[in-house]
Amino acid sequence: MPTEEAGAPDDHPEAASGEELPGQIERRLLGRPASMGRREVSEGAGVEPVVARRFWHAMGFQNIEDDDAMFTEADLEALKRVARLIGEGEVSEELALGMTRAFARTSDRLAVWQTQLVAESLTSPFSEELEGRDSRSVPEPRIAADAAELLASICDDIEPLLVYVWRRHLTNAIARMLADADPAVHADPSAPIRVVGFADLVSFTSFVRRMSERQLARLVQRFELLASDVITEHGGRVIKTVGDEVLFVHTDAAAASAIALDLVDAMAQDELLPPVRVGLAHGRVVSRLGDVFGLTVNKASRITAVTPSGHVYVDEDMAKVLGSVSGFSAIERRRRMLRGIGVVTLHELQRAPGGRGLALRDGSA
């Protein structure tokens, strides 16, 4: 328990002036106060100052003078870890810099997002309406101070969750990479054949720029619920939803086609959601830990990326299967070079006159 007297300046942001609060938060988040210059950190880690400067820039931080006391023990330990990885030959300096940039860009976006979420959670929706203010604007000083205090107080509990989520995603990414690179997987006759579909909200990034975090949360939740309802109604299986995209599979081409077209219709009729586009591919997939991998999955994703808003495009294999399925037609459109796939002839999926897909509930997706 803290030994300082309750109400001391370091305990509560309201006891500090606006100039003091950033320093307090920095000490709480980074540990010891910044006391070292770049040259001192470089020498402590056993690397040249130019190398330390490269990694500092890779993390996305501004340029500083050699003698500016901007660094803490945490900075020194981080640089030591990187230097050790490079020195032991585990990774090259180029790879280490690339991974640092990846961490930095993701972490910067995550930190900004979370500060906005916390500040918004402390802002009364009623007061926003009275003031006609978007909660994505700069919060008032009291809200900003309270948000800073809350983030600092829960940081130690959130940090393990961040590492856990990253390891989970890293596991999935490695599994997909290995599955995609294994020729035996694609030739394995025992691998199940599925229709894989990606549904993607069109112009999502520009759409959400006009929204508050609370509005964005409602939109994403609405999309996930509506997509899940449509997919499960036709006996499909939702693999995952990530923000503006949903991945689903089905064993039946007709049911998968009905899902795709119904998703387009459902989003078009919903006033909250932007239009959607869907890509379908038919082929063998690898299922691991509830996810699906392989060329068919990659193809469906690439097809979705080139599909016009409000339409459904399918690959050649799916078009061939639909040739013997009533209620749908696949109209050849054009050949496209898809990154990582090659040249693919795309077909637009449409309902045949008077036809609607039947809901198939075989539960085998």
Could you say what each language-model-derived stretch is?
Residues G310-A365:
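Cytosolic regulatory/linker segments at or just downstream of nucleotide-handling modules
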Residues A58, Q62, L85, Y164, ...:
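Conserved, well-folded catalytic cores of nucleic-acid-processing
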Residues M1-E43, V47-D182:
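Arg/Lys-rich, alpha-helical DNA-contact motif
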Residues Q221-G235, L247-R284, L295, K299-T304, ...:
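Alpha-helical scaffold within the catalytic cores of cyclic-nucleotide enzymes
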Residues R288-G294:
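Short, surface-exposed loop/helix-turn segments at secondary-structure junctions
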Residues A184-D262:
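Catalytic NTP-binding/metal-coordinating core of nucleotidyl cyclase/transferase enzymes
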